[in-house]
Amino acid sequence: MIMKFVEKYFEFEKYGTNLKVETLAGITTFMTMAYIIFVNPQILSTAGMDFGAVMVATCIASAIATLVMGLYARYPFALAPGMGLNAYFTYGVCLGMGIDWRVALGAVFISGVLFIILTLTKIRTWIFNVIPNAIKYGTAVGIGLFIAFIGLKSAGIIVSSKATLVTLGNLMEPSTLLALFGIFLTSILVSRNVIGAILIGIIVTSLIGMILGISPFPEGIFSMPPSIAPTFLQLDIMGALNLGLLTIVLAFFFVDMFDTLGTLSALASQAGYLDKDGKLPRVEKALMADATGTVVGSLLGTSTVTTYIESASGIALGGRTGFVSVVVAMLFLLSLFFYPVVKAIPPYATAAALVIVGALMMRSVKYIDFDDYTEAIPAFITLLTIPLTFSIATGLALGFITYPILKVFTGRWKEVHWLVYVLAVIFALRFVYLSG
């Protein structure tokens, strides 16, 4: 009876699939993105948040958002806190600007609410279409460089230098050697298309470090989930409404939008969901899952939730319905009971995940039109300044300002949508406000 309902609700027959295929696809998708359970708490705890609470928030927010995607939008797409935005949350906003993590969570919440409003009014897709590709792809590449740099820094491969700002670290340090090993191992696994390559890299590197005595073994395998109280409903929304934080809210919003719509398009194309006009049916429902995840995540205690391109692994295995997402969500909830293992994973083991994910994000560079300097230069400024300033907001701001200036002074001002001019003024005023 239940199986009949499941098959009918998820339209197994229509998509030519079955319970076994959908379940295996869900397990595969989870394996490819489970690294976020280890990486996200490590990144956000650096901002002063409780490690255990963030781990719980990560699993629950991912499960809820993915369930909404599976049951409401009925697509095999999984969601979790976005890589890049979590790094920006910690290093760009909290540590870089000295903003309390509660206020930063408030900014994430506001961006999520904005996301919901614009999704309901269908304005979100319109905004995405009028933003220049140079800014979209420049941002993606810049975030890739940003998180890769953080990975190299946390591994001790790159260290600070008074003479040159940064320099090569001591590669003979045991933890640094292990991080290098992890990067090479994960690179090989990714290149060979091994399912769960990043997760395997983290686990193997950690085990070697534990065996060599560089880091301690976990105190156990299973336990009850830690308390979420230290981060649950701790966000400071009023503090985030400060005018000076407007560009941070916009940064969270735009990056989530670029990431989600770009990922949805790629996954929908791979799965054969696009209609004859190249549009994704029920796209608003899919976007709502993403927006809901961000709002719920901020309430629980984690940074922006977004759709994961790793969902492609489950689709490649034959997953075609929302049941895949249901399986992924259940596995995220099951992960709550593996806290001792998550807590024992050392930073040098997760460094490889940051570097490899950063490398994978570089693929967007091929979409930048380097033959047109009015497109190439704004994209270059965006992708360069994000890692160098440790701020996605600053990179976005400089990109939005540079783009219309070059178009105007080359007589091509009509190519720029009026919204881009408005955003350029807002971002320019941001610099005036900060300098004042």
From Swiss-Prot:
Keyword Plastid in record: no
InterPro entries: Azg-like, Azg-like_bact_archaea, NCS2
GO terms, molecular function: purine nucleobase transmembrane transporter activity
Keywords: Cell membrane, Membrane, Transmembrane, Transmembrane helix, Transport
UniProt entry tagged with the keyword Transport: yes
Transmembrane segments: 24-44, 51-71, 79-99, 103-123, 139-159, 171-191, 194-214, 235-255, 322-342, 345-365, 381-401, 416-436
Predominant location: membrane
Cell compartments where the protein resides: Cell membrane
Cleaved signal peptide residues: none
GO cellular component, one term: plasma membrane
Topology in the lipid bilayer: Multi-pass membrane protein
Similarity section: Belongs to the nucleobase:cation symporter-2 (NCS2) (TC 2.A.40) family. Azg-like subfamily.
Name of the protein: Putative permease MJ0326
